[in-house]
Every structure is written in structure tokens, then in C-alpha cells.
Amino acid sequence: MDIEGFREYCLSLPGVSEGTPFEKFSRGKFTILVFYVSGHMFCYFNIDDFSSITIKCDPGEMVELKERYQAIGEPFNGDKRYWISVHLGQDVPDDKVRELVSNSYRLVAQKYR
């Protein structure tokens, strides 16, 4: 999965917008692209190093996902109770990555719509 294909997938979900809200904090060292639904984040990643994504996750599914996939672990700068990171190009198939992103989108959309 490449960065543009992933971005297009995220933007294809209803009501999704994107932004780079953390530029002032990174001081040019990196750029985090964030995807929002209803004004709330559901996915983000470092544009300069598209090797992992961070997404919202149902807390009840986290343990099983982390046990099943080595590429799923602690989030990059997120609450470990609600977020996971997925390291791309490892043991999580692209279809599963898209499914996890869709689940993240639904979790956030349901809460804030």
C-alpha cells in the first residue's frame, strides 16, 4: 500500500477531511497527516515516513489484534487504551489495514454524529 492510495482510501469515507495540525509542534522535523470525521481524529501518520499508521481501536479488540499480528502495537503519541499503531508492509494484509481504518472511522463517527 502506498501513501497516495492510503490517503485516497481515507478520503473516500463519507465526511472525511484531512489536515496537518501539529506543524507548529514538530518545528519542521516531521509532518503528521490527520484524517477527521465530524471534526475528530480517526487516523494519522507521518508523511515523511509512511511506515506506520495510528488508528482508533475498540478496546475489546486490542489484545486479540496485538496477539495475532506482530505489526500491531502501541500508538504513536496516542492513548494506549483507545489507539493502536499498525506497521505497514509486515504481517497485516492491506485489506485488513483498510478494515481497521474503516472500524476506526465508524468508532469516531458513531460517537460524534
Predicted regions and their residues:
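Charge-dense, helix-prone N-terminal extensions
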Residues: 1-113
